């Protein structure tokens, strides 16, 4: 039996990293009896090892909570736990579209952070009702009154009746549940007898059940035995089971309007289940599709290569499996003269890249080399055509290019004002253009336009070290702008190394080239002949370092003072070295690649 609409609440929790939303979710599950004490562990919803170690949420998860409110009525609360990190904003947007309300969790000691803002604005765009929750009230540094005022000033929502809680100790959790019931709206229209219309919120792969699809039913009823059709892809499947997460999987007979649950339908490929698609019944389809989500656009690209070429097939299989779970990760094959066969992969951001790499190494035991991350450039050719450039090594001849456009981002940085000067200097070094600066109490909020190219290397690390970890950073893509960009190639022994080529701004090319050459000089071992390492832009060498040759003392066995004999031996050695240099191949160790690619503008 489905729950009546006015007793359902679909909500998500919006917060900055570390403000305690996964802990709050744990307490809500515990209080409503979703899991018994034995099954309870910290961060129940963060199911991946990486999520728990890093203390971040990557995949959005859902739970159905049953709650008997103080007014004696029974309510069904569907919680969608969302990631807070900027790279996973795509997951956030999907979760928010399936709900009607949000809990905004703010740390009472830290106040509003950059990512809180980004996610709250997304919730407001989705016309969500917002309940403010102040967490960590038990900390000595908590300043609830100051933070309430800050929320009103920065976000512009009324925080006077914010719920004050401590998710760690369980203080005030009941008040949160009451606020959800009383302040958040029930799902809008929904007709049980209308043709089935449901939104596909997420999908992931389970080795036993195939693809599990998370759905939010809007009209009609979804039950076992129906044949459903994905309106976007046209694929049809018979429904095998319907159920909900409590957070364990519990099968139910049917899912009615306003409800969130899962279905399995022997779907083999997650690619067939596009997030944001409309699910309807094949026999009696709905007239109009839902406006789907925007598909995630990869922002950062890099090459992933196996250290051992024999692992290539394993890597291909592993990537296919990750692609099953992560719709925003894309890859295609590529070959590199230096690194052999591998893949060119697209990611939503640097954290996404790190996590995919770590999951490949961890879950599939692969050793990988990552090439320098690059962004997508637009090339305007002289013949009037336009091209997208994902890999700097594929850049066409400069003569054919009229101009190059690069992606720019709008970055919001929140920082204590002590570090403001250093952060502004960092942004200016990275070609940033200041848009806005406002003060909220002792914290400053700066808005900058920055080229993404300058951010992908190590901007985030530098920002954190300059501000002793206090600054928070959030960005979204704004537009493409023309830039004076040049391709920098690295030549080792006069041979270009494709894996190290990159697009840089002309003004920074020399500095970047010199730093890279110096780094490679330390990393490449000496050979029997002299090795020049050069950074070149077009035909012009902008930096050079030389690794001196290992030298065998050929004159050691000469006694006596005959200088001509010595000279003859030295000349002969010189000839040999010259020939060796002509035909000799320089072995660049894998460590050298890894270290050189890690190098930022130190």
Swiss-Prot record:
Biological role stated in the UniProt entry: Required for accurate and efficient protein synthesis under certain stress conditions. May act as a fidelity factor of the translation reaction, by catalyzing a one-codon backward translocation of tRNAs on improperly translocated ribosomes. Back-translocation proceeds from a post-translocation (POST) complex to a pre-translocation (PRE) complex, thus giving elongation factor G a second chance to translocate the tRNAs correctly. Binds to ribosomes in a GTP-dependent manner.
Gene Ontology biological process terms, A to Z: positive regulation of translation
SUPFAM superfamilies in UniProt: EF-G C-terminal domain-like (SSF54980), P-loop containing nucleoside triphosphate hydrolases (SSF52540)
PROSITE patterns referenced in this protein's UniProt entry, alphabetically: G_TR_1, G_TR_2
Similarity annotation: Belongs to the TRAFAC class translation factor GTPase superfamily. Classic translation factor GTPase family. LepA subfamily.
Domain tr-type G: 6-188
Gene that this sequence comes from: lepA
Uppermost EC category: hydrolase
Taxonomic source organism: Brucella canis (strain ATCC 23365 / NCTC 10854 / RM-666)
Listed EC numbers: 3.6.5.n1
Protein name: Elongation factor 4
């Amino acid at each position: 039996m489905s729950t009546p609409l006015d007793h359902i609440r679909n909500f998500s929790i919006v917060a900055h990293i570390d403000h305690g939303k996964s802990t709050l979710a744990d307490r809500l599950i515990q209080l409503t009896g979703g899991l018994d004490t034995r099954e309870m562990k910290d961060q129940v919803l963060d199911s991946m090892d990486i999520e728990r170690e890093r203390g971040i949420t990557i995949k959005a998860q859902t739970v159905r909570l049953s709650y008997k409110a103080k007014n004696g009525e029974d309510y069904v609360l569907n919680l969608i736990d969302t990631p807070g990190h900027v790279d996973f904003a795509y997951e956030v947007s999907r979760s928010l579209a399936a709900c009607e309300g949000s809990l905004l969790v703010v740390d009472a000691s830290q106040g509003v952070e950059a990512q809180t803002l980004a996610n709250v604005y997304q919730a407001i765009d989705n016309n969500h009702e917002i309940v403010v929750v102040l967490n960590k009230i038990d900390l000595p540094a908590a300043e609830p009154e100051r933070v309430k005022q800050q929320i009103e000033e920065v976000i512009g929502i009324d925080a006077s009746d914010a719920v004050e809680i401590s998710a760690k100790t369980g203080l005030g959790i009941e008040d949160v549940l009451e606020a959800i019931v009383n302040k958040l709206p029930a799902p809008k229209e929904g007709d049980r007898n209308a043709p089935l219309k449901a939104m596909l919120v997420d999908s992931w792969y389970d080795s036993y059940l195939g693809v599990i699809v998370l759905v939010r039913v809007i009209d009609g009823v979804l039950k076992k035995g129906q044949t459903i059709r994905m309106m976007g892809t046209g694929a049809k499947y018979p429904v095998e089971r319907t159920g909900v997460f409590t957070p364990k999987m519990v099968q139910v007979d049917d899912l009615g309007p306003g409800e969130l649950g899962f279905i399995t339908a022997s779907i083999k490929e997650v690619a067939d289940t596009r997030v944001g698609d409309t699910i309807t019944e094949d026999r009696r389809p709905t007239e109009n599709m839902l406006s789907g989500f925007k598909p995630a656009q990869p922002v950062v690209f890099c090459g992933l290569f196996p250290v051992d070429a024999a692992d290539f097939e394993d890597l291909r299989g592993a990537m296919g499996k990750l692609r099953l779970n992560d719709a925003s990760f894309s890859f295609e094959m590529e070959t590199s003269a230096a690194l052999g066969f591998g893949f060119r992969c697209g990611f939503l951001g640097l954290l996404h890249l790190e996590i995919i790499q770590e999951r490949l190494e961890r879950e599939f035991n692969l050793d990988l080399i990552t090439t320098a991350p690059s962004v997508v450039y637009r090339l305007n050719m002289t013949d009037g055509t336009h091209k997208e450039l994902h890999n700097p090594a594929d850049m066409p001849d400069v003569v054919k290019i009229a101009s190059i456009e690069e992606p720019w981002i709008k970055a919001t940085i929140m920082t204590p004002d002590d570090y403001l000067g250093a952060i502004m200097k960092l942004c200016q070094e990275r070609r940033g253009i200041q848009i806005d600066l406002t003060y909220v109490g002792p914290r400053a909020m700066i808005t900058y336009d920055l080229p993404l190219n300058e951010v992908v290397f190590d901007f985030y690390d530098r920002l954190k070290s300059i501000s002793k970890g206090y600054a928070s950073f959030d960005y979204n893509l704004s537009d493409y702008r023309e830039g004076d960009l040049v391709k920098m190639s690295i030549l080792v022994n006069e041979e270009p190394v494709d894996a190290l080529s990159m697009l840089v701004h002309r003004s920074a090319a020399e500095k970047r080239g010199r730093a890279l050459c110096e780094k490679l000089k330390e990393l490449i071992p000496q050979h029997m002949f002299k090795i020049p390492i050069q950074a070149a832009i077009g035909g012009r060498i902008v930096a050079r370092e030389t690794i001196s040759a290992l030298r065998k003392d050929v004159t050691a066995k000469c006694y006596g003072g005959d200088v001509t004999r010595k000279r003859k031996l030295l000349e002969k050695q010189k000839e040999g070295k010259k020939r060796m240099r002509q035909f000799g191949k320089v072995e660049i160790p894998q460590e050298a690649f890894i270290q050189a690619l890690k190098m930022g503008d130190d």
